[in-house]
Each structure stands twice: as C-alpha cells, then as structure tokens.
Amino acid sequence: MYNEIINYIKNKNVAILGFGREGKSTYKFIRKHLKDKMLTVLDQNKNATSDINDDNLILINDNYLDY
C-alpha cells in the first residue's frame, strides 16, 4: 500500500495544509520515502517548521488559505 501512495505522489506537487500532528506525520512519511521531494507547508504559525532544516521545504503562512 505504501508503494502505491509513494508512486502516486512522486511526480506531483505536494502541499501539506496544517503542520500539527497529522501534518508532521505526513512530512515524516514523505521524507522517509522521497528525501528530495519539494514540499510546501501551509500553516498560520510562522514558526511551524522552525525546528526543521530542509532546503526542499517551503513554508507559506500569510494568507495561506488563498493558495
């Protein structure tokens, strides 16, 4: 089942809406299987990803629901 999910998202643009418990879990899953995948996190908290050092991660927080 995991391989189906990975194959489905590997050539898609991926955005994670919200970086709470589920968002972080999703991020960790994708990073485990697709280490260089560009990801976008949309969260109202400007410090949501402050503890993550990842060059392939974009955080959008101002007006994040407009994207």
Q: What are the roles of these predicted feature ranges?
A:
Residues 1-67:
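N-terminal leader/targeting and accessory segments in enzymes
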